[in-house]
Amino acid sequence: MSRIMATIVKPVEQKTKHLDYFLSQCHRRRYPAKSTIIYAGDKSDSLFYIVKGSVTVIIEDDDGREMIMAYLNAGDFFGEMGLFDNMDSRSAWVKAKTECEVAEISYTKFREIAQQDPRVLYFIGEQM
């Protein structure tokens, strides 16, 4: 029985360790419900992690109508498209659906910590 528990507990401990390290490198901010966290068209230079709360990802169609693309919750990332696609500007608005605590890290800092410990990339990849 202890072997089974070890195979469960060890990966959880590793994930917690990587998350704690990742969050220690981030700037945390709180946003009231319905406030805008990201504006479409803004410079794309940061990755965000939802520590607490939920957000809505919104785009505009060709007629200017808002379309909800996703609801994201604690444990989810957003703002990653610019990290992987080299996009210069944000393609969507992200608004706090509820009161939120969000951790933000610049793409530059994220790449630095990923070079120092590539296992962080695997942790992040599992979350996306």
Spans of model-derived segments:
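Cyclic-nucleotide recognition modules
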Residues: 70-126
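A short beta-strand-loop-beta hairpin characteristic of the jelly-roll/cupin
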Residues: 55-67
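Short phosphate-coordinating micro-motif centered on Lys-Gly-acidic
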Residues: 37-42
